[in-house]
Structures are given as C-alpha cells and as structure tokens.
Amino acid sequence: MRCFPVFIILLLLMASAPSFDARPKTEDDVPLSSFRDNLKRTLRTLLDPRRCCYETPGCCVIG
C-alpha cells in the first residue's frame, strides 16, 4: 500500500511529459531517405558507362 502513492505520482509525471521531440530541428537533421536517394543516384551514375564516361571522363571504368 505504500507504493500506491508513488505509482500514482509516476503515472501523473508520465502523462505530463511531452510526446514529441522537444529539440528544435537543425540543418543536420536530414531524413535518412535523402541519403539513400543520393546513394542510389551516385551508384546509377557510376554503373551507367555512357553517362559516366561522357559527363565525367575520369570515372569511366570500361577502357
């Protein structure tokens, strides 16, 4: 019975806690999906010999 008041107080504290991220977003908070998109685009460019060799001659892997 002694733990009951403590339990109630903890429940009240949890209910009043913010349910969202209270930190402000910065420029570094970029979604992971944009990193994946950039990676896919880079790999597609590197694996496409026509596009890679003509746009960036230094990255041509095929002779």
Swiss-Prot record:
Alphabetical keyword list: Amidation, Cleavage on pair of basic residues, Disulfide bond, Secreted, Signal, Toxin
Tissue-specific expression: Expressed by the venom duct.
TM ranges: none
GO CC term, one of those recorded: extracellular region
Molecular function GO labels: toxin activity
Propeptide residue intervals: 23-49
Signal peptide: 1-22
Isoleucine amide modifications at: I62
Keyword flag Secreted: yes
Main location: secreted
Subcellular location: Secreted
Modification after translation (UniProt): Contains 2 disulfide bonds that can be either 'C1-C3, C2-C4' or 'C1-C4, C2-C3', since these disulfide connectivities have been observed for conotoxins with cysteine framework V (for examples, see AC P0DQQ7 and AC P81755).
Family according to the record: Belongs to the conotoxin T superfamily.
Entry note about domains: The cysteine framework is V (CC-CC).
The protein's name: Conotoxin Pn-B01411
Native species: Conus pennaceus (Feathered cone)
Source lineage: Eukaryota, Metazoa, Spiralia, Lophotrochozoa, Mollusca
